[in-house]
Amino acid sequence: MNNNTTAPTYTLRGLQLIGWRDMQHALDYLFADGQLKQGTLVAINAEKMLTIEDNAEVRALINAAEFKYADGISVVRSVRKKYPQAQVSRVAGADLWEELMARAGKEGTPVFLVGGKPEVLAQTEAKLRNQWNVNIVGSQDGYFKPEQRQALFERIHASGAQIVTVAMGSPKQEIFMRDCRLVHPDALYMGVGGTYDVFTGHVKRAPKIWQTLGLEWLYRLLSQPSRIKRQLRLLRYLRWHYTGNL
């Protein structure tokens, strides 16, 4: 019988990744023995692997995060190739965030939301309260000045939040979480990118069948042809994968 409160780790190009079998494993791991883990969650996909390779500051930021997990199907396939016995599946960050919010609502876990446009953040708060009765103890949209950061960190600390989700894009959100943890270490932090936009319907996500087939990247490319340059960068990752340089 599998123990869902522990998880193996796998190394890709020097980066330690948690190997979750599925979403339930991820949730049971993060809420092991009824106690929410503390630290930072970072979703890893092929694009982020490339950024880590090219940017020493980002690499240090992400290496310092306790919970790095495979958000991209390419990363999952690379883990399975390097470790043929690995029972690891993709856990999409947007889905994990929703499941965390549902669990937080059920257990009354205090949540602080950071990032996004003011109207999107307001809609996110309203939907979280209506859908799962989430205990939102504070929020801040992404439009604040650098000199306001410290006061925001103090607000988060004073709120007693046990989950802090940050939608600012990478690496801004990783920098924010690292610095905020110096003031408020006793929480689970999660960088969520554009998740608030998807959750509120401002951005359409790929249909489930595309996600299941591992083609969400292709759906986004067809929806946004301007992403072609970003996708072409991934050829470098494919070279690593197919040459076994993992």
From Swiss-Prot:
Function: Catalyzes the synthesis of Und-PP-GlcNAc-ManNAcA (Lipid II), the second lipid-linked intermediate involved in enterobacterial common antigen (ECA) synthesis.
Keyword annotations: Glycosyltransferase, Transferase
One BP term from GO: enterobacterial common antigen biosynthetic process
Record's protein name: UDP-N-acetyl-D-mannosaminuronic acid transferase
Pfam family name, one: Glyco_tran_WecG
Annotated disulfide bonds: none
Gene: wecG
Enzyme class, spelled out: transferase
Keyword Transferase belongs to the record: yes
